[in-house]
Regions:
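A short, Lys/Arg-rich alpha-helix, primarily the initiator
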Residues: 2-27
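Short basic helix-loop element that most often maps to the first helix and adjoining turn
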Residues: 20-38, 63
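Conserved hydrophobic/aromatic packing and binding residues within compact polymer-binding modules
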Residues: 21, 35-36, 46-49, 77
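Short coil turns linking two alpha-helices in DNA-binding domains
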Residues: 31, 42-45, 59, 73
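Recognition helix of helix-turn-helix/homeodomain-like DNA-binding domains
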Residues: 40-56
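Short, basic-rich loop-to-helix N-cap that marks the start of a DNA-contacting helix
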Residues: 53-68
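Short C-terminal boundary/hinge segments that cap the last helix of small helical domains
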Residues: 71-82
């Protein structure tokens, strides 16, 4: 089992991922409710993912589902600045 290393703070990366998802969702003319329904999560969960400064863990599977629903490559959702 992997031991959690508390020396890393990924808040900014989660924020960028959330911004990316929101950007492509809006570009697809979808509401949070519509996208959430397409990928099988609650609107509140999607809202938390898109919210700035919220460390909302999301699975790779969910990233793939969101990317497919938005018709974008998954890497575009997780592309973050180093």
């Amino acid at each position: 089992m992997r031991k959690k290393n508390n020396n890393y703070d990924h808040t900014e990366k989660y924020t960028e991922i959330g911004y990316n998802i929101a950007y492509y969702r809006k570009h697809a003319n979808l509401t949070q409710e519509q996208l959430a329904e397409l990928v099988g999560i609650s609107r509140a969960h999607l809202s938390a993912i898109e919210a700035p400064k919220v460390n909302r863990n999301l699975s790779v599977e969910l990233v793939f589902d969101i990317a497919e629903a938005l018709h974008v490559d998954a890497y575009k959702l997780i592309k973050v600045r180093e």
